[in-house]
Amino acid sequence: MAGRSGVNDEELLRAIRVIKILYQSNPYPNDSGTRQARKNRRRRWRARQRQIRALSERILSSCVGGLQEPSTLPLPPLDRLSLNPEEDLGTSETEHPQGTATT
């Protein structure tokens, strides 16, 4: 697949097939039974979904090589930051007074 270097396409497709099988192995529970039984089934289903999601992330990260660290963003100087809302009023030309609509 274009844009990736060093990743075997067959290995990636195999990982995706495994993840698909994992998700298909845990269908949403049916609506029969008492309210409490349905609630318990949904709770167990959500727990299994969390486990499947964690496994899927581990499979993909081992195949692709993990997530890239985001580059650090330059932050403004802390002495210019303010929590006073009065200083923030009217700083943007796109702000409109409350209650007026723009078309």
Curated annotation (Swiss-Prot):
Keywords: AIDS, Host cytoplasm, Host nucleus, Host-virus interaction, Methylation, mRNA transport, Phosphoprotein, RNA-binding, Transport. Residues 25-34 have a biased composition (Polar residues). It is found in: Host nucleus, Host nucleolus; Host cytoplasm. Pfam families: REV (PF00424). Residues 18-26 are annotated as: Homomultimerization. Residues 36-48 have a biased composition (Basic residues). One of its GO terms (molecular function) is DNA-binding transcription factor activity. The keyword Signal does not apply. InterPro entries: REV_protein. Residues 25-48, 66-103 are annotated as: Disordered. Asymmetrically arginine dimethylated at one site by host PRMT6. Methylation impairs the RNA-binding activity and export of viral RNA from the nucleus to the cytoplasm. A motif (Nuclear export signal and binding to XPO1) lies at residues 73-84. The keyword ATP-binding does not apply. A motif (Nuclear localization signal and RNA-binding (RRE)) lies at residues 34-50. The modification Phosphoserine is found at S5, S92. GO terms for biological process: mRNA transport; viral process. Its main location: host cell. GO terms for cellular component: host cell cytoplasm; host cell nucleolus. Homomultimer; when bound to the RRE. Multimeric assembly is essential for activity and may involve XPO1. Binds to human KPNB1, XPO1, TNPO1, RANBP5 and IPO7. Interacts with the viral Integrase. Interacts with human KHDRBS1. Interacts with human NAP1; this interaction decreases Rev multimerization and stimulates its activity. Interacts with human DEAD-box helicases DDX3 and DDX24; these interactions may serve for viral RNA export to the cytoplasm and packaging, respectively. Belongs to the HIV-1 REV protein family. HIV-1 lineages are divided in three main groups, M (for Major), O (for Outlier), and N (for New, or Non-M, Non-O). The vast majority of strains found worldwide belong to the group M. Group O seems to be endemic to and largely confined to Cameroon and neighboring countries in West Central Africa, where these viruses represent a small minority of HIV-1 strains. The group N is represented by a limited number of isolates from Cameroonian persons. The group M is further subdivided in 9 clades or subtypes (A to D, F to H, J and K). Escorts unspliced or incompletely spliced viral pre-mRNAs (late transcripts) out of the nucleus of infected cells. These pre-mRNAs carry a recognition sequence called Rev responsive element (RRE) located in the env gene, that is not present in fully spliced viral mRNAs (early transcripts). This function is essential since most viral proteins are translated from unspliced or partially spliced pre-mRNAs which cannot exit the nucleus by the pathway used by fully processed cellular mRNAs. Rev itself is translated from a fully spliced mRNA that readily exits the nucleus. The RNA-binding motif binds to the RRE, a 240 bp stem-and-loop structure present in incompletely spliced viral pre-mRNAs. This region also contains the NLS which mediates nuclear localization via KPNB1 binding and, when the N-terminal sequence is present, nucleolar targeting. These overlapping functions prevent Rev bound to RRE from undesirable return to the nucleus. When Rev binds the RRE, the NLS becomes masked while the NES remains accessible. The leucine-rich NES mediates binding to human XPO1. This is Protein Rev. It comes from Simian immunodeficiency virus (isolate EK505) (SIV-cpz).
